[in-house]
Structures are given as C-alpha cells and as structure tokens.
Regions:
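Transmembrane-helix motifs of polytopic, lipid-linked glycan transferases
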Residues: 48-77, 82-87, 115-118
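Extracytoplasmic catalytic/substrate-binding loops of multi-pass membrane glycan-assembly enzymes
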Residues: 1-6, 16-34, 41-44
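Membrane-interface micro-motifs in multi-pass membrane enzymes
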Residues: 84-117
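Membrane-interface alpha helices of multi-pass inner-membrane proteins
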Residues: 130-147, 152-160, 182-192
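Loop-to-helix entry region of an early transmembrane alpha helix in multi-pass inner-membrane enzymes
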Residues: 26, 30, 40-59, 78, ...
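Membrane-interface transmembrane helices that cradle and orient dolichyl/undecaprenyl
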Residues: 108-134, 161-171
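Transmembrane helix irregularities
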Residues: 38, 83, 111, 141-146, ...
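Transmembrane-lumen/periplasm boundary regions of multi-pass, lipid-linked membrane glycan transferases
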Residues: 168, 174-198
Length: 198
C-alpha cells in the first residue's frame, strides 16, 4: 500500500518528506509518481513498470555473465535467477518479488548497480571518455535509493578506480576524476535544489 499511496500522492503534486512520509531516498518514489501522472494511478501501472525493470535486470545480468561464461552457461544462470527470485513467494504476503516489491528502491537499485558493473568493466577493458562520468552518474543515482546500494556502488567504483590507478602507473587522469565527481554529485545536487524549493 505504501508504494502505491506515495506514488499517487506525488502524482497529485505532494512533495516527499513534506506532505508524505518516505523511508528511503526519493528517486524511486518520483519515478513511480511520474508513471502515475502519465498513465494514471493503479497497481497494474507499477506491475508493468516493475516487469520492465526486471527485464532490464535480466538482460544486464545475462550480458554481464556472458563476459566471463559461455552463452549457454550465462543463459542457465539467468534462468535460475528468474525462477528463484523473479516471481517467487516465500511468505503469505506476495510483496517480496520483482512484480510487486516491498520497496521499489531495491529493484531500481539492483538495475543501477548492474548497469554500473557494465560501465566499470568497460572502463577497465575498453576505456571510453564517457565511462567515468556515466559511472559517477549511476553511482550518484544510488545515493537517492537505499544505503545498501550506495555502499555497493561506492565499493565497486572505488575498486575500479584503485585498479585503474595501479594499472596506469600510479596515476589517474584529472579529466576522469572530474567526470566521475560531476556525475556522482549531479543527482544529489538536483535533489537538494528541488527539495530546497519545496
């Protein structure tokens, strides 16, 4: 009920933390509020959006596993993930799955962290100028979710940065550091400005 009510209130113009309580960061609630504003409020709007997020998670997981495994093995591992975690009900309350999660911050966070893993892998193996900025942005978006995803994103990014530092002879390019910092701080700055005006 909380996920539906909060998104509905935000779609009607309420401000999170002022007009309606929120337990976690604002990103997921405002994404859901935007969906309700566009498609109208309703459980099935969130279910379809959640299934799209789940499809993104499955694709990201498969592609990530594919980097180290054969296609059949990566597909089998992704299928196990789908069967065990996708639509399971381990309690009488059916809200601990991807179609109707207890907190959308979990599903959105998982997708962001998997996308971050792809970007960091690319930064390590096929560096592009946009990798550090995008990695910072994805890590910065996790700051607007739940703490466990913030820790995961920062640990992964820190490890990748450390590895990049040592593999480049003990130095990082200033442009990479600045791009990462800009991406990392942008979501929080935008959130602070938004809530400061409301």
């Amino acid at each position: 009920g909380r996920e539906l009510y909060t998104a509905w209130q935000i779609a009607e113009g309420a401000v999170l933390y002022r007009d309606v309580d929120g337990f976690y960061g604002p990103l997921s609630q405002y994404v859901n509020g935007a969906l309700f504003r566009i498609f109208g409020p309703g459980l099935m709007v969130l279910v379809w959006a959640n299934l799209a997020v789940f499809a993104g998670i499955m694709l990201a997981l498969y592609l990530f596993l594919r980097r180290g495994w054969r296609p059949a093995t990566a597909l089998a591992a992704t299928a196990v993930f789908i069967l065990v975690f996708g639509f399971s009900r381990f309690s009488t309350i059916g809200s601990f799955n991807f179609a109707a999660p207890y907190a959308h911050e979990v599903t959105h966070g998982m997708l962001l962290v998997l996308l971050l893993a792809h970007v960091l892998w690319g930064w390590r193996h096929e560096p592009r100028p946009w990798h550090p900025g995008l990695a910072g942005l994805l890590a910065g978006l996790t700051l607007l979710l739940k703490p466990e995803f913030v820790l995961t994103a920062l640990a992964a990014t820190g490890f990748a940065g450390w590895e990049r530092f040592w593999s480049s002879g003990g130095r990082l390019r200033r442009a990479e550091v600045l791009a990462w910092l800009a991406g990392m701080t942008a979501p929080t700055v935008l959130a602070v400005v938004y809530f400061g005006q409301h």
